[in-house]
Amino acid sequence: MKWWKLSGQILLLFCFAWTGEWIAKQAHLPVPGSIIGIFLLLISLKFNLVKKEWIQDGADFLLKELILFFIPSAVAVIRYRDTLTQYGIDLILIIMISTLCVTLVTGLLTELLLKRKGSTQ
């Protein structure tokens, strides 16, 4: 039974992603459809159109297995050996700096939201 529940939750998450892709394509937006889908999911959660319990296990599963989604990308990088040889150090620096920036912004926003949530309770 758990397998069916998990599959349904993942399907619901993908429905938001697909809807976002469709909106981005139809409206010719410069924003990736996946971002629009995440925004739609956020709004749906905020206004209780979708309950957290409906997606929690599916989201947890996808996060646990996230590394599997990066394997094809990592393998594809091998095709650009010349570029890596020429710009490898620059690329590593860019990746490290951008990862640091994303981590810092995420941490700051999380702290801000938690403080804000704490002050309203």
From Swiss-Prot:
Predominant subcellular localization, coarse grouping: membrane
Membrane topology classification: Multi-pass membrane protein
Record carries keyword Chaperone: no
Source species, domain of life: Bacteria
One of the GO biological process terms: killing of cells of another organism
Cellular localization per UniProt: Cell membrane
InterPro entries: Holin-like_CidA, LrgA/CidA
Transmembrane stretches, start-end: 7-24, 28-50, 62-81, 91-113
UniProt KW keywords: Cell membrane, Cytolysis, Membrane, Transmembrane, Transmembrane helix
Entry GO terms, CC: plasma membrane
A Pfam family: LrgA
Function in brief: Increases the activity of extracellular murein hydrolases possibly by mediating their export via hole formation. Inhibited by the antiholin-like proteins LrgAB. In an unstressed cell, the LrgAB products probably inhibit the function of the CidA protein. When a cell is stressed by the addition of antibiotics or by other factors in the environment, CidA possibly oligomerizes within the bacterial cell membrane, creating lesions that disrupt the proton motive force, which in turn results in loss of cell viability.
Similarity comment text for this entry: Belongs to the CidA/LrgA family. CidA subfamily.
Protein name listed in UniProt: Holin-like protein CidA 1
Gene that encodes it: cidA1
